Curated annotation (Swiss-Prot):
One of its GO terms (biological process) is programmed cell death. It comes from Mus musculus. Cleavage by CASP8 relieves autoinhibition by releasing the N-terminal moiety (Gasdermin-C, N-terminal) that initiates pyroptosis. Belongs to the gasdermin family. GO terms for cellular component: cytoplasm; cytosol; plasma membrane. Pfam families: Gasdermin, Gasdermin_C. The keyword Transmembrane applies. Keywords: Cell membrane, Cytoplasm, Lipoprotein, Membrane, Necrosis, Palmitate, Transmembrane, Transmembrane beta strand. Residues 1-230 are annotated as: Triggers pyroptosis. It comes from the Eukaryota. Intramolecular interactions between N- and C-terminal domains are important for autoinhibition in the absence of activation signal. The intrinsic pyroptosis-inducing activity is carried by the N-terminal domain. This is Gasdermin-C.
Length: 468
């Protein structure tokens, strides 16, 4: 378990148990999920939830001026407190090795107070069917063209006073008889890290939110106020891209060639039935396209991601820039990836931006601990073995919604001895599986399905890049 803002917001959502309540992923965006803020959905992927990122505008920025703005309803403060400690430690018996130990010890707690600010459906009526401004922000052009839906925040749980999230973690590996790849010490290897996190969270930061979809037709904006309402696209019609400022009347198509390219207004395609083969085929196709990129491009992408893996904020910022189609300036390794995208040197049938987004979206599902363990796994060349192990868990259990005991295959565990085994078990435990280093048995948990799928995709991508 990694103790970060992301972990805090997810834990708060579990405690509040609100229907359709979603956690805010990143502290840097905690003030961008307030009431009326507009969110754009990310590209959809199999077995991964669609995420929602703020576009930097509120609904009030899009509507005609001087409209009545409904007053939010504010709940009484809700105190939330949580303390947790976690330990994963065991002596290891490793073939041809005299012995050793590995373990993780972590502790964390928080004591916060939140309150809900919401606009209930009856109050939203004053905003329904309002005229849009004549000139709309250019981000709407991209969303219309790409078929991305937009949403508005209608409820937000805010922190009522400044607070600090604190946590400590201790990771230790000690293996006799081998030379650790991280710290070389004579005939034995030892790696130990101790980390204390202190994350200040300002008053007004949003930890969780609810959203409702926008539908834009005939120069007006509608907020879908019922979960039972038949889903529509935000932009029921596609358009030919225009440059400069976007005017609503410019979105009317001047040719009739688009008519056969869209579904009837108000319809939505049924999703493909998900099974592991669908996920495997999707990951295989993406890694195949990745392999067709030039070695130079793959090396730049791999090196850049390796330097960013332990920094969720940088990964998230890069994902936002790509989702919002903003290839602006970015320092560090993320900037190198943007440079490659600007070159547009990839083969015409390969969309480098989509490939990078695929990996970013998978990584953002994982915890901070997993991100750092992935970097360590790359250094220790564990990826091929980890891919097969995760696949062996997903393949037989993917379709089951209930808890099923399973046993990890000995032949897949054999290459993952010592540190490799402890690192891999921690990756699995962070997905929600209960793991013990001396026990290959565990139990399938439906809540582990999504993080395991994201881990499978991340490992597969990084493995392909590492082999370039």
């Amino acid at each position: 378990m990694s103790y970060t803002f992301d972990w805090l917001s997810k834990d708060v959502v579990k405690k509040l148990q609100g229907r359709d309540l979603r956690p805010v992923k990143c502290l840097s965006d905690a003030t961008k999920f307030c009431l009326f803020n507009i969110l754009q959905e990310t590209s959809s992927r199999l077995a991964l939830k669609t995420e929602y990122i703020p576009v930097g505008f509120t609904l009030l920025h899009l509507l005609e001026p001087n409209i009545p703005v409904p007053e939010p309803e504010v709940s009484a403060p809700i105190p939330l407190k949580h303390t947790i400690s976690q330990k994963l430690k065991a002596d290891l018996d490793v073939e041809t090795i005299a012995g050793g130990e590995a373990g993780f010890v972590k502790s964390c707690g928080y004591d916060i107070e939140v309150q809900s600010k919401s606009i209930p459906n009856p109050k939203l009526e004053s905003l329904q069917n309002r005229k849009l401004l004549d000139q709309l922000p250019t981000f709407m052009k991209t969303c219309w063209k790409d078929g991305k839906n937009l949403y508005v925040v209608t409820e937000a749980y805010e922190v009522t006073k400044d607070t600090v999230l604190e946590g400590t973690s201790n990771s230790k590996f000690a293996i006799k008889g081998i030379i650790n790849q991280l710290v070389k010490v004579g005939g034995s290897g030892q790696w130990q890290t101790e980390k204390t996190d202190s994350i200040p969270i300002q008053k007004g930061s949003v930890l969780a939110y609810k959203k409702q979809q926008l539908v834009i037709e005939d120069n007006t904006c509608v907020i879908l106020t019922s979960a039972n309402t038949k889903k529509k696209m935000t932009f029921p019609m596609r358009f030919v891209g225009m440059s400069g400022h976007l005017r609503y009347q410019d979105l009317v198509i001047e040719t009739g060639s688009w008519i056969n390219d869209i579904d009837p207004i108000g319809t939505i395609k049924e999703p493909t039935h998900l099974d592991f083969m669908c996920l495997q085929n999707e990951v295989s196709e993406q890694t195949r396209l990745l392999a067709e990129l030039s070695k130079d491009v793959q090396e730049v992408v791999f090196s850049s991601f390796l330097h960013m893996l332990c920094d969720r904020d940088v990964l998230y910022d890069l994902m936002k820039m790509l989702e919002l189609n903003q290839l602006g300036h970015m320092d560090g390794p993320g900037g190198k990836i943007l440079d490659e995208l600007r070159k547009d040197s990839s083969l015409s049938w390969i969309n480098l931006k989509d490939l990078i987004l695929y990996l970013l979206q998978a990584l953002m599902v994982l915890s901070d601990t997993q991100l750092c363990l992935l970097a360590l796994s790359v250094e220790m060349r564990l990826l091929p073995h980890q891919v097969e192990l995760v696949k062996s868990i997903l393949q037989p259990n993917f379709k089951y919604p209930w808890n099923i005991p399973f046993t990890l295959q000995p032949q897949l565990l054999a290459p993952l001895q010592g540190e490799g085994l402890a690192i891999t078990y921690e990756l699995l435990e962070e997905c929600g599986l209960k793991m013990e280093l001396n026990n290959p048995r565990s139990t399938w948990d439906l809540e582990a399905k999504m993080p395991l799928s994201a881990l499978y995709g991340s490992l597969s991508f990084l493995q392909q890049l590492s082999e370039a």
